[in-house]
Structure formats: structure tokens, C-alpha cells
Amino acid sequence: MKIRKMVMEDYEKVYELWMSCAGMGLNNLDDSQEGIEKFLRRNPETCFVAEEREIIGVILAGNDGRRGYIYHTAIHPDYRKQGIATKLVEHVERAMTALEINKVALVVFDRNDTGNSFWEKQGFTVREDLIYRNKALSEIVRIDT
């Protein structure tokens, strides 16, 4: 298995992977080809794919100069429980450290027991003192997987 930086040419295969994974929480703007292209332009050093003849894993990550954020981590269902997601997270953490980002955050659906267990094993803690809020500035259509 090889892990490398994600490039725009990966988009179709990455999108197919996202669609094969239940509960991804995609939307028509941020996860469109244009949305991902914009994200990769801003974050070329922190987005990765795992390959084994095809793309079997992906992690998107970015930062605002202070804090890193992880988005859309997905592993093909046939390749789960093999340490691939952990390796992708390690790549992101090294990339963030190289960018002098000292902390990383992410959002996981409350109902995603598998994801929440994984992130806990990676050392991510739940912030009981925070309430996550969101406001759409454009009309966004959720894409359920």
C-alpha cells in the first residue's frame, strides 16, 4: 500500500469511495469537483490517499493558521481494520507539525460509533465544554451515503 498526497485527478475515485461509505455527510457545494479543487489549492500538503492498485482510503485536512481540521476520512469497506486510517492520520499529523500547527480538530456524527471509537483510539478527546454550531451562507444540499 502506498500513501501519497491527493491531487485533483483523484477526485472521481475519491468521490466514488465516499459514496461507498455510509454516513459520510457530503454536500453538493463543498464536495463538488470545484469545492474539492478549491480545498486542495488551499491545503496541498495535508490531504492524502491510500492506494493499492486503486484508491482505498482518503483523508482531507486543512488549517486556518492556528488549528488543523480533519474532514472526510474514508476507507473502502473491503480494506478496513488494517491500519490504513491510522497511517493516513499519521501523515496528516506529520504534515500539520511541519506547518507548525499545534492542534487538530474534527467533527464526527454522534451516531457514528465506529468513527467515534477510531478517533478516541487516535487520541482525540470529546470537548464537553463546546457546542458545535454551523451556518450555511449558500443553499447546501446534503448528499446522504
Where are these regions (language model features)?
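A short beta-loop-alpha structural element at the N-terminal edge
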Residues: M1-V14
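A short helix-loop-beta-strand connector motif used in the catalytic cores of GNAT acetyltransferases and
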Residues: E37-V49, Y69
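Conserved acetyl-CoA-binding loop-helix of GNAT-fold acetyltransferases
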Residues: I75, K81-R94, K121
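Conserved beta-strand-loop-alpha-helix junction that forms the acyl-donor binding cleft
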Residues: L106-G115, N134
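Terminal substrate-recognition subdomain of acyl/acetyltransferases
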Residues: K121-Q122, I131-T145
